[in-house]
Amino acid sequence: MHVIVFVAPYFTENARRFIQVTASLPGVALGLISQDPIDFLPAEIRALVRAHVRVGDGLDADHLVGAARQIEKELGPLHRILGVIEQIQEPLAEARARLGLAGMSADVARSFRDKTRMKDALRAAGLPVARHRLVIDDEAALRFAGEVGYPLVVKPPAGAASQDTFRADDDASLRKALVGARSGGGGAVLLEEFVTGEEYSFDGLILNGKVGFQSVSHYDPAPLTVMQNPWIQWMVVLPREVDAPDFDAIKAAGTRSLAVLGLETGMWHMEWFRRR
Protein backbone atom coordinates (compact mmCIF):
# COMPACT_ATOMS: atom_id res chain seq x y z
CA MET A 1 0.00 0.00 0.00
CA HIS A 2 1.13 3.54 -0.75
CA VAL A 3 0.58 5.91 2.16
CA ILE A 4 -0.67 9.20 0.74
CA VAL A 5 -1.06 12.23 2.99
CA PHE A 6 -3.70 14.67 1.80
CA VAL A 7 -3.78 18.18 3.27
CA ALA A 8 -7.12 20.00 3.32
CA PRO A 9 -7.18 22.86 5.83
CA TYR A 10 -10.97 23.05 5.52
CA PHE A 11 -13.46 20.48 4.30
CA THR A 12 -14.99 22.46 1.48
CA GLU A 13 -17.17 20.69 -1.07
CA ASN A 14 -14.23 20.59 -3.47
CA ALA A 15 -11.89 19.21 -0.78
CA ARG A 16 -14.36 16.47 0.07
CA ARG A 17 -14.43 15.31 -3.53
CA PHE A 18 -10.64 15.14 -3.74
CA ILE A 19 -10.39 13.31 -0.41
CA GLN A 20 -12.96 10.73 -1.50
CA VAL A 21 -11.38 10.12 -4.89
CA THR A 22 -7.83 9.91 -3.51
CA ALA A 23 -8.82 7.54 -0.73
CA SER A 24 -10.64 5.31 -3.24
CA LEU A 25 -7.60 4.79 -5.47
CA PRO A 26 -6.36 1.17 -5.57
CA GLY A 27 -3.43 0.51 -3.28
CA VAL A 28 -3.74 3.80 -1.37
CA ALA A 29 -3.90 4.21 2.40
CA LEU A 30 -4.98 7.80 3.01
CA GLY A 31 -3.76 9.94 5.87
CA LEU A 32 -5.53 13.26 6.26
CA ILE A 33 -4.33 16.57 7.74
CA SER A 34 -6.84 19.34 8.39
CA GLN A 35 -7.83 22.22 10.62
CA ASP A 36 -11.46 21.08 10.61
CA PRO A 37 -12.42 18.18 12.88
CA ILE A 38 -12.86 14.86 11.13
CA ASP A 39 -16.54 14.82 12.15
CA PHE A 40 -17.15 17.54 9.56
CA LEU A 41 -16.77 14.89 6.86
CA PRO A 42 -19.70 12.68 5.83
CA ALA A 43 -19.60 9.21 7.33
CA GLU A 44 -18.95 7.54 3.96
CA ILE A 45 -15.80 9.64 3.45
CA ARG A 46 -14.61 9.26 7.05
CA ALA A 47 -14.70 5.50 6.55
CA LEU A 48 -12.10 5.80 3.79
CA VAL A 49 -9.57 7.75 5.90
CA ARG A 50 -6.97 5.53 7.59
CA ALA A 51 -5.48 8.23 9.83
CA HIS A 52 -6.28 11.85 10.64
CA VAL A 53 -4.34 14.61 12.39
CA ARG A 54 -5.88 17.98 13.17
CA VAL A 55 -3.52 20.98 13.17
CA GLY A 56 -3.82 24.60 14.22
CA ASP A 57 -2.59 26.00 10.92
CA GLY A 58 -2.94 23.98 7.73
CA LEU A 59 -0.77 26.48 5.82
CA ASP A 60 2.24 26.16 8.12
CA ALA A 61 5.05 23.80 7.07
CA ASP A 62 6.03 22.98 10.67
CA HIS A 63 2.48 21.87 11.44
CA LEU A 64 2.34 19.79 8.27
CA VAL A 65 5.65 18.05 8.96
CA GLY A 66 4.68 17.22 12.53
CA ALA A 67 1.30 15.86 11.47
CA ALA A 68 2.77 13.84 8.61
CA ARG A 69 5.23 12.18 10.97
CA GLN A 70 2.37 11.20 13.26
CA ILE A 71 0.61 9.59 10.29
CA GLU A 72 3.84 7.82 9.34
CA LYS A 73 4.06 6.27 12.81
CA GLU A 74 0.53 4.98 12.42
CA LEU A 75 0.47 3.85 8.77
CA GLY A 76 4.10 3.34 7.80
CA PRO A 77 6.50 5.05 5.36
CA LEU A 78 4.99 7.93 3.40
CA HIS A 79 4.84 7.91 -0.40
CA ARG A 80 3.45 11.38 -1.15
CA ILE A 81 2.05 14.47 0.54
CA LEU A 82 -0.26 16.64 -1.52
CA GLY A 83 -3.05 19.22 -1.53
CA VAL A 84 -5.00 21.02 -4.22
CA ILE A 85 -5.56 24.63 -3.16
CA GLU A 86 -3.11 27.22 -4.47
CA GLN A 87 -2.36 28.80 -1.10
CA ILE A 88 -0.94 25.57 0.30
CA GLN A 89 1.59 24.73 -2.41
CA GLU A 90 4.62 26.50 -0.91
CA PRO A 91 4.29 25.08 2.64
CA LEU A 92 3.54 21.68 1.10
CA ALA A 93 6.72 21.85 -0.96
CA GLU A 94 8.76 22.81 2.10
CA ALA A 95 7.23 19.95 4.09
CA ARG A 96 7.92 17.58 1.20
CA ALA A 97 11.61 18.50 1.22
CA ARG A 98 11.93 18.05 4.98
CA LEU A 99 10.16 14.69 4.83
CA GLY A 100 12.32 13.49 1.93
CA LEU A 101 9.34 12.94 -0.39
CA ALA A 102 9.16 13.33 -4.15
CA GLY A 103 7.13 16.12 -5.68
CA MET A 104 7.20 19.78 -6.64
CA SER A 105 10.03 21.71 -5.00
CA ALA A 106 9.62 24.90 -2.99
CA ASP A 107 11.42 26.88 -5.69
CA VAL A 108 8.99 25.74 -8.39
CA ALA A 109 5.98 26.27 -6.11
CA ARG A 110 7.16 29.82 -5.42
CA SER A 111 7.38 30.53 -9.15
CA PHE A 112 3.71 29.65 -9.54
CA ARG A 113 2.53 31.29 -6.33
CA ASP A 114 4.45 34.59 -6.59
CA LYS A 115 2.88 36.26 -9.62
CA THR A 116 5.67 38.85 -9.91
CA ARG A 117 8.32 36.14 -10.00
CA MET A 118 6.23 34.18 -12.51
CA LYS A 119 5.75 37.11 -14.86
CA ASP A 120 9.43 38.03 -14.71
CA ALA A 121 10.43 34.49 -15.65
CA LEU A 122 7.91 34.26 -18.51
CA ARG A 123 8.89 37.66 -19.92
CA ALA A 124 12.60 36.73 -19.75
CA ALA A 125 11.78 33.63 -21.80
CA GLY A 126 10.11 35.72 -24.49
CA LEU A 127 6.52 34.87 -23.64
CA PRO A 128 3.90 37.63 -23.88
CA VAL A 129 3.22 39.12 -20.45
CA ALA A 130 1.43 42.31 -19.47
CA ARG A 131 3.74 45.03 -18.18
CA HIS A 132 3.81 44.88 -14.39
CA ARG A 133 5.55 46.13 -11.28
CA LEU A 134 5.61 45.19 -7.60
CA VAL A 135 5.20 48.34 -5.50
CA ILE A 136 5.34 49.10 -1.79
CA ASP A 137 4.03 52.64 -1.56
CA ASP A 138 1.55 54.90 -3.32
CA GLU A 139 4.27 57.03 -4.90
CA ALA A 140 5.76 54.04 -6.73
CA ALA A 141 2.29 53.00 -7.87
CA LEU A 142 1.58 56.46 -9.26
CA ARG A 143 4.91 56.46 -11.11
CA PHE A 144 4.01 53.15 -12.78
CA ALA A 145 0.60 54.56 -13.71
CA GLY A 146 2.38 57.52 -15.30
CA GLU A 147 4.56 55.20 -17.38
CA VAL A 148 1.88 52.72 -18.49
CA GLY A 149 -1.32 54.74 -18.29
CA TYR A 150 -4.76 53.84 -17.00
CA PRO A 151 -6.62 51.59 -16.51
CA LEU A 152 -4.50 49.32 -14.30
CA VAL A 153 -5.12 46.01 -12.56
CA VAL A 154 -4.26 46.09 -8.85
CA LYS A 155 -3.86 42.86 -6.85
CA PRO A 156 -1.76 41.00 -4.24
CA PRO A 157 1.42 39.35 -5.60
CA ALA A 158 0.30 35.95 -4.27
CA GLY A 159 -3.45 36.11 -4.74
CA ALA A 160 -5.72 33.36 -6.00
CA ALA A 161 -8.25 33.71 -8.81
CA SER A 162 -9.65 37.28 -8.71
CA GLN A 163 -9.59 37.72 -4.93
CA ASP A 164 -8.62 41.25 -3.79
CA THR A 165 -8.26 42.27 -7.45
CA PHE A 166 -9.33 45.73 -8.58
CA ARG A 167 -9.40 47.98 -11.62
CA ALA A 168 -8.05 51.52 -11.25
CA ASP A 169 -9.06 54.18 -13.79
CA ASP A 170 -7.43 57.25 -12.20
CA ASP A 171 -5.21 58.33 -9.31
CA ALA A 172 -8.07 58.35 -6.81
CA SER A 173 -9.29 54.84 -7.66
CA LEU A 174 -5.68 53.60 -7.68
CA ARG A 175 -5.11 54.81 -4.12
CA LYS A 176 -8.37 53.16 -3.04
CA ALA A 177 -7.50 49.88 -4.81
CA LEU A 178 -4.06 49.80 -3.16
CA VAL A 179 -5.74 49.70 0.26
CA GLY A 180 -7.92 46.75 -0.75
CA ALA A 181 -5.10 44.81 -2.42
CA ARG A 182 -2.73 45.27 0.53
CA SER A 183 -5.14 43.35 2.75
CA GLY A 184 -4.25 40.20 0.82
CA GLY A 185 -0.59 40.83 0.07
CA GLY A 186 1.14 41.79 3.29
CA GLY A 187 1.92 45.32 2.08
CA ALA A 188 3.33 44.75 -1.40
CA VAL A 189 0.97 45.17 -4.35
CA LEU A 190 1.25 43.96 -7.94
CA LEU A 191 0.25 46.41 -10.67
CA GLU A 192 -0.42 45.33 -14.26
CA GLU A 193 -1.37 47.12 -17.41
CA PHE A 194 -5.01 46.50 -18.29
CA VAL A 195 -5.18 44.29 -21.37
CA THR A 196 -8.52 44.14 -23.15
CA GLY A 197 -9.58 41.12 -25.11
CA GLU A 198 -10.99 37.61 -24.72
CA GLU A 199 -9.88 35.72 -21.61
CA TYR A 200 -9.16 32.00 -21.71
CA SER A 201 -7.90 29.40 -19.27
CA PHE A 202 -5.45 26.66 -20.21
CA ASP A 203 -5.58 23.56 -18.00
CA GLY A 204 -3.87 20.22 -18.12
CA LEU A 205 -2.00 17.32 -16.59
CA ILE A 206 1.73 16.76 -16.97
CA LEU A 207 3.65 13.63 -16.02
CA ASN A 208 7.44 13.50 -16.04
CA GLY A 209 7.60 16.51 -18.33
CA LYS A 210 5.08 15.19 -20.88
CA VAL A 211 1.65 16.76 -21.29
CA GLY A 212 -0.95 13.99 -21.10
CA PHE A 213 -4.12 16.07 -21.17
CA GLN A 214 -4.97 19.67 -21.93
CA SER A 215 -8.08 21.77 -22.36
CA VAL A 216 -8.97 25.36 -23.17
CA SER A 217 -11.97 27.25 -21.78
CA HIS A 218 -13.30 30.72 -22.46
CA TYR A 219 -14.50 33.12 -19.72
CA ASP A 220 -17.52 35.19 -20.73
CA PRO A 221 -17.30 37.88 -19.48
CA ALA A 222 -13.82 38.23 -17.95
CA PRO A 223 -13.55 37.48 -14.17
CA LEU A 224 -12.61 41.06 -13.24
CA THR A 225 -15.81 42.31 -14.88
CA VAL A 226 -17.79 39.85 -12.78
CA MET A 227 -16.00 40.91 -9.58
CA GLN A 228 -16.98 44.51 -10.30
CA ASN A 229 -20.58 43.58 -11.14
CA PRO A 230 -21.78 40.85 -8.74
CA TRP A 231 -25.17 40.68 -10.46
CA ILE A 232 -23.60 39.18 -13.59
CA GLN A 233 -24.04 35.45 -14.16
CA TRP A 234 -20.83 34.58 -15.95
CA MET A 235 -20.04 31.53 -18.05
CA VAL A 236 -17.07 29.24 -18.55
CA VAL A 237 -17.38 27.86 -22.06
CA LEU A 238 -15.53 24.60 -22.70
CA PRO A 239 -15.26 23.85 -26.43
CA ARG A 240 -15.82 20.24 -27.36
CA GLU A 241 -12.82 20.34 -29.70
CA VAL A 242 -9.60 22.18 -28.84
CA ASP A 243 -7.64 21.21 -31.97
CA ALA A 244 -8.84 24.23 -33.94
CA PRO A 245 -6.10 26.62 -35.15
CA ASP A 246 -7.62 29.38 -32.99
CA PHE A 247 -6.18 27.66 -29.91
CA ASP A 248 -2.69 26.84 -31.24
CA ALA A 249 -1.04 29.95 -29.82
CA ILE A 250 -2.62 29.46 -26.38
CA LYS A 251 -1.57 25.80 -26.19
CA ALA A 252 1.97 26.55 -27.38
CA ALA A 253 2.41 29.34 -24.84
CA GLY A 254 0.94 27.23 -22.04
CA THR A 255 3.23 24.28 -22.72
CA ARG A 256 6.26 26.56 -23.01
CA SER A 257 5.35 28.18 -19.68
CA LEU A 258 5.57 24.84 -17.89
CA ALA A 259 9.14 24.36 -19.07
CA VAL A 260 10.09 27.89 -17.99
CA LEU A 261 8.54 27.53 -14.54
CA GLY A 262 9.91 24.03 -13.97
CA LEU A 263 6.77 21.94 -13.47
CA GLU A 264 7.51 18.27 -14.23
CA THR A 265 4.48 16.47 -12.79
CA GLY A 266 1.15 17.87 -11.71
CA MET A 267 -1.96 19.77 -12.69
CA TRP A 268 -1.86 23.38 -13.81
CA HIS A 269 -4.18 26.23 -14.64
CA MET A 270 -3.17 29.41 -16.44
CA GLU A 271 -5.09 32.33 -17.86
CA TRP A 272 -4.49 33.98 -21.22
CA PHE A 273 -5.78 37.04 -23.01
CA ARG A 274 -6.26 37.32 -26.71
CA ARG A 275 -6.01 41.03 -27.49
CA ARG A 276 -8.77 42.67 -29.47
Model-derived features: positions:
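ATP-binding N-terminal substructure of ATP-dependent carboxylate-amine bond-forming enzymes
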Residues: M1-V108, R113, E139
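Short, solvent-exposed amphipathic alpha-helical segments in soluble enzyme
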Residues: Q20-S24, S183, L207, Y219
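CheY-like receiver
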Residues: A67-I71, F144, A177-G180
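Glycine-rich phosphate-binding loop signature in dinucleotide/nucleotide-binding domains
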Residues: I71-L78, G146-V148, G184-G185
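A conserved helix-loop-beta module that forms one wall/lid of the active-site cleft
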Residues: A97-T165, D171
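Conserved ATP-binding module of the ATP-grasp superfamily
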Residues: P128-R131, P151-V154, F166-S201, M227-V236, ...
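ATP-dependent carboxylate/phosphate-activation module, predominantly the ATP-grasp catalytic core
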Residues: V195-Y200, G204-L263, M267, R274-R276
